[in-house]
Regions:
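Alpha-helical bundle segments that constitute or directly flank the non-heme di-iron/ferroxidase center
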Residues: 4-37, 99-126
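Soluble, non-transmembrane catalytic domains of enzymes that act on hydrophobic metabolites at membranes
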Residues: 9-13, 35-41, 45-46, 59, ...
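Short, charged, amphipathic alpha-helical segments
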Residues: 14, 40-48, 77, 103, ...
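Charged, amphipathic alpha-helical oligomerization/scaffolding segments
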Residues: 15-22, 48, 52-55, 59, ...
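Preference for long, well-ordered alpha-helical segments
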Residues: 23-26, 105-191
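Conserved alpha-helical segments that form or flank metal/cofactor-binding pockets of metalloenzymes
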Residues: 39-79
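Carboxylate-rich helix-loop segments that flank metal/cofactor sites and access channels
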Residues: 62-103, 165-175
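Long, non-catalytic architectural segments outside compact domain cores
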Residues: 194-195
Length: 195
């Protein structure tokens, strides 16, 4: 860990840990929504998200402690704006349709994935194998979670739009099938050649 300033790494880990906790809080608030209870796939997904983000948050906290990092006043200020945005999501959780909550989860998980991509690069630059392992595992898990949300999202949209449960199920499954095609390997560009 000689190439990168330890304080910078610690601040970055603390920043990501705070973001992870805010997203986890939003997920926990969503679980209280009566509307969520109407879609069993959403209930199962929120349980999965809560478990995964709880574990990730604990590992990030341990990494922050290892770097003797505490959330600074400056960082708290920066996070306050974002936390305010998330608080809006949380406050709306009880009245928002499930599809909107799933969309917000998709966005939040994507932001966490970007943060863990940055953390992986930081850990590589710092030659910190433990942090590389944490970031890599979290990123892989977040990719799976985003994919799971992408399956529940179209189903929740269709169920909110159609009154006929059989028709909603049929079209919902078709929507999942059609939208999941975008996640096929041929739609992902090969890694750029590094010269």
């Amino acid at each position: 860990m000689s190439r990168v300033d330890k304080d910078r790494i610690g601040n970055f880990v603390s920043d990501l840990h705070s973001l992870e906790k805010h997203v986890l809080n939003a997920i926990q608030k969503q679980k209280e929504s009566d509307k969520i209870q109407e879609i069993s796939e959403a209930v199962e997904l929120l349980d999965l998200l809560e478990d995964a983000l709880t574990e990730q948050s604990q590992r990030l906290n341990q990494a922050a402690v290892r770097y003797d990092s505490a959330i600074t006043t400056e960082l708290k200020s920066k996070l306050a704006g974002f936390a305010g945005s998330l608080a809006g999501l949380v406050d709306g959780a009880r009245k928002d349709p499930v599809s909107k909550l799933m969309r917000d989860n998709y966005t939040a998980l994507s932001m966490l994935a970007a943060g863990h991509t940055m953390l992986k690069a930081t850990a590589l630059a710092a030659d910190d194998e433990d942090l590389q392992h944490i970031a890599g595992n979290h990123l892989a898990e977040l990719a799976q979670l985003v994919t799971e949300v992408s399956r529940v999202l179209p189903l929740s949209v269709v169920r909110e739009l159609l009154d006929d449960p059989e028709q909603a199920e049929e079209i919902g499954q078709l929507a999942i099938e059609k939208t999941q095609k975008a996640w096929k390997g041929e739609n992902i560009r090969e890694a750029p050649e590094i010269v």
